[in-house]
Structures are given as structure tokens and as C-alpha cells.
């Protein structure tokens, strides 16, 4: 939407990994943290003993010297309020589609929810103008035996009026294509910001860097 600004003037973009529970968001972020050398600082995780995210994971990462706060949302349906909180002010989204065929309905539920909460940002009314917030898809778990075909995912994106969405086929447990997808989303995020500035679109001044506050009881 609009990056925040640190006291030293550095712009900080916010990138969010969205998608159903078990889709691989935390696994992918942990891969970026542990294996790709892009992280600056620790990986913060608020999760339950079984590894399900309760609120978010958060990591500060640098891509070509640009700083990103990267969050994952808690995918379980009951954590809607937490997702809404994390989504605020997002500059770019990576949707983790669980390719396991059995998870089809969960993917659809999650995409619909995102469009309800953020549809005005990730959809464009005019095909010639890119949406305010770029979104890419990671079709994750491509190593599993019974996976949804990429064409079926494309059909869903077309029906959702996002026909040009870029899809990466990922395996988060082995890191396959995770960095490529991440760097692509990060670049889209920065590119979109400068496009907005160049075209004179209303870009509110960058606000101070913030973190989501924990939901109340
Ligand atoms: N086979 C396979 N398993 C994966 C892959 N990515 C993640 N997993 C597994 O899927 C399970 C769920 O992964 P998480 O990363 O915790 O999923 P999540 O999207 O963060 O889930 P929530 O925190 O509930 O939203 C874990 O057991 C992972 O090891 C993958 O690409 N292939
Ligand atoms: Mg998680």
C-alpha cells in the first residue's frame, strides 16, 4: 500500500504470505531465514505446540538493499481477526496454494477471504492498470503425489479476475523455487511503488515503521 519509513529514512516494505493452514507459509519463511542469507535479524514466530501459527511469523529481510518486513498469517479459519490485523498496510502478497488435492476447498476459502478483505487492492478494475498491491501465487507441495494441476489454479485465478497472476511451483520443505518466488514478489512490490510515484497516483507519505499489536483476549 505504502511503505513505512525508519528513523534513518530507509523505506520498509511489507510483504505477507497468505493462504490456508498447512499450505507451507511458515516453512517457506523459515527457508528464507535459514538458507538464503536474506534475513537481517531473528525469525519471530507466534505458534502453538503443534507448529500452527497463532498470530504471525515475522522476519526482516533485505533484497538488493531494500528492506522488507515479511509476515505469514495464521491460516486456520478461526484466526480471521489475526489475519485481518496482519494484512493491514501490506505492499505485496504471496498466496501459498496447498497443491494437495484434498486441500482444494481450503484454498478457495482462503482466496475468497482475501478478496473480501483486500479485493479492492489486489484486483484492478482496468486491465491496463496493475492492481495497487501485487500478488503472486506459490503452488506449494509440488512433491506430493496427488496434486492439483496448474491449469486448475489458473482457472480459479481467471474466475477471480486475476488472470495475469504469476505462479511459481514450489516445494517449501526443500526450498525449491522459494527464493525465486520471494525475490520476484519483493521486486514487484518495489516496482509498483515507483510506478505509483511516477504516474502521480496518490501515494500517502510513508508512516513510521510499526508492528501488529497482539489481539485482545
Ligand atoms: N510435502 C511437503 N510438505 C510441506 C511443504 N511445505 C510445507 N510442508 C509441510 O506442511 C506442514 C504445514 O506447513 P506450515 O509451513 O506449518 O504451514 P502454514 O501455512 O504455516 O500453516 P498455518 O501456520 O496453520 O497457517 C508442515 O508439516 C510442513 O513440513 C512442501 O512443499 N511439501
Ligand atoms: Mg504457519
Regions found by a protein language model. Give the residues of each.
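Canonical P-loop GTPase G-domain recognition
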Residues: 143-199
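Conserved nucleotide-binding/hydrolysis micro-motifs of P-loop NTPases
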Residues: 22, 76-77, 100-102, 141-145, ...
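Switch I (G2) and immediately adjacent beta-strands of P-loop GTPase domains
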Residues: 44-82
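Conserved beta-strand segments of the P-loop GTPase G domain that flank and frequently precede/overlap
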Residues: 70-72, 94-98, 136-140, 169
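Conserved G1/Walker A P-loop phosphate-binding module
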Residues: 1-46
